[in-house]
């Protein structure tokens, strides 16, 4: 199972959520959202994505984190869902973020098992 690159953030997600919460509750100020442009993520990872796309084997299965953490219609990658952080910092997943990926891996393994 090959897992493609994950979107990453330039800021610590949990710290940013804390600051956002303080600004909104104490000062009624809106802090910027915690997301990145999908196009930026793709362009920053274009080389490795192209290399991974060239890999092909009947026993190679691919997981695309951008399908899990990015909204194609909004063209944004998210780092929190309903106030729950999916990343513990700029690049590491929280348990909630890891659960999303783990569920996808389990689903893929079950699909592979059912095909045999």
Regions found by a protein language model. Give the residues of each.
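Extracellular glycan-modifying ectodomains
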Residues: 1-116
């Amino acid at each position: 199972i090959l897992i493609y690159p994950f979107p990453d953030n330039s800021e610590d997600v949990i710290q940013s959520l804390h600051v956002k919460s303080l600004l909104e509750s104490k000062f009624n100020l809106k802090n910027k959202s915690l997301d990145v442009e999908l196009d930026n993520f793709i362009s920053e990872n274009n080389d490795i994505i192209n290399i991974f796309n060239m890999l092909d084997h009947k026993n190679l299965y691919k997981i695309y984190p951008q399908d899990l953490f990015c909204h194609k219609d909004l063209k944004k990658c998210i780092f929190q869902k309903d106030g729950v952080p999916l990343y513990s910092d700029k690049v590491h997943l929280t348990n909630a973020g890891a659960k999303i990926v783990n569920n996808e891996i389990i689903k893929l393994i079950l699909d592979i098992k059912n095909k045999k």
